[in-house]
Amino acid sequence: MSFGKLYTYPKAPRSTMVLFVAKYNKLDVEICNAFPIKVYPEKGGVGEEYLSKFHTGKVPALETADGFTVYESNAVAWFLAKQDPNTKLCGSGLKEETTVLRWASFTNYELLPPIMAWIRPIIGRAPSSPEILKTCEEACELTIRAIEKEITGKNYLVGDTLTLADLFVVSGLARGYQYVFTKSWAEKHPVVHEYYMRVRNDKDGIFDSILGSNIIRDEPGGTYPDYDGL
């Protein structure tokens, strides 16, 4: 029996970690396309039926077989992780659980926004100039340094095993690697790059099954048809 329906669109960055958890816990989840009008205006939005269940019209969103609905990536990922009563993805004990939630919020509010602000001029979705691109890159640097300080000398962000903290942060970093985190960028950030590659390549290739092969660009790039929005 299907666990439920997970609504998203291809390569949506805030859905990556949710899809990972579903696969990791071997949940029988039906993936349903939903295209928010903010991201794909040409598709006309998600429709009234969707909005009646998920009032903000955002993805990811989950509807379980018994009719329970939840949206916002932090909540959906947490709910799916907890389907395994012995899960370690949420951390062990209150302090670790709190730290995991902090990293989830950090990804959505501190990591993804500056990455997306850097990507938009690159792909022609915002004005671009050398000064604009430099400012965008510098804004990303502040966030990357914060990750670097936390992960130095450790394999995982929280505790000694993989948690949602790692899944959120690596999912956010993956967006950067798709467009602006080039080989030269990786050379300048060896600690974060090594951490990203280690987690990205862990757990039976689950990330690759969601995002495709991990290719690092020689130069920043990407075009609108490849752009998957926020």
Region spans (language model):
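Short, solvent-exposed turn/loop segments enriched in Gly/Ser/Thr/Pro and often Arg
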Residues: Y9, L164, N214
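Short, cationic motifs built from Arg/Lys/His that form the positively charged side of catalytic pockets
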Residues: T16-L19, R198, D202
